């Protein structure tokens, strides 16, 4: 079962005056797509999905970033009363259509423009409910602990489940420091009675839009406005000044260095050959300053580029995985061309092979529970993740010693190995590691 729409970005609904800007914003994540994938509601999206044969089950979170952008574009102004009413209408419609929760991307435009009070107001339809709010927090670098405290405030106020997405502390100065403190905060909040938990991907590198390295205030107005700013000498100088010293945003190049940021999903003839090279390498090859190389690349690509960024510490990943309230995720995006992150193909295999079999940080039963029942229950999917009378017969058969990830950052599109058989709804879709051609996947709605 795949659950999409995380980090505030979902593909539906996608209609209205601001829809073209949202489509452009999603392009580094989804690849470019046409009108045939623009739906007026999540129900319409699900209906189209059900007309398409699916290998796996699919559920969807309602992306609050998509919904806010449909209401107010990428403006940084506080929402008006009327805009909040329209946002609540869209949230309630998506939940009624079967979304298994909502997601936030507080590190991204336009959600980075919320105050804490505005965020709580935006989430009012979730108050006292059972559906979770998943959140890419406002910061994951120097301000990550304060960002977690903000979300604990939200959880206390709304009394709904809150899932901290891909918990980490970005940057060497935060490794081994921020994560232990955050795990203590989560433990204390759970003891207080808050329904808070977290997840983590089993890699030290992440992947998202390349514009995420820029100060958020320059992202107001959407990608067209940002592209224009990247071509303006005054705006470039202001961006550089903020990136050289700023700690009040997720300043990735400052935290980990240009050598640890790798652009992907490049499309122009000028920059496509540099895909897979770090920003430091690209700057050196072009004879440019790293900031100029970054700004020129983004402007040429009209900001529709992605990145792989090496940001986290293995010791922190292991500490999070050991926590009883954590689960592993892929956090994968699925670009239709070019390089992708190896987690697209190998997350579960890497978790089982590296962290369980080789590192021994969890027993196999503990690991399987996290991958199955614990994850399903968090999203209210009561017929998934268990072997029981009345449950769906979705089963994976494997020998632990044979599981392995085959992908690498330079060659990510490699299927993992060791899954002997996979049954979806009781029908074999993989036998002896080979696809059978069956397509028993279904759309899953909250119930």
Where are these regions (language model features)?
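Metal-associated gating/positioning segment near the N- to mid-region
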Residues: 1-36
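Acidic, glycine-enriched loop/beta-strand segments at the rims
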Residues: 280, 305-317, 363-368, 376-413
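Active-site neighborhoods of metal-dependent hydrolases
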Residues: 46-49, 54-81, 85-108, 153-156, ...
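Divalent metal-coordination and catalytic microenvironments
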Residues: 58, 98, 136, 199, ...
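Hydrophobic residues within beta-strands of alpha/beta enzymes
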Residues: 2-4, 102-103, 133, 162, ...
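Short acidic, glycine/serine/threonine-rich loops at helix termini
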Residues: 7-19, 69-75, 116, 145-149, ...
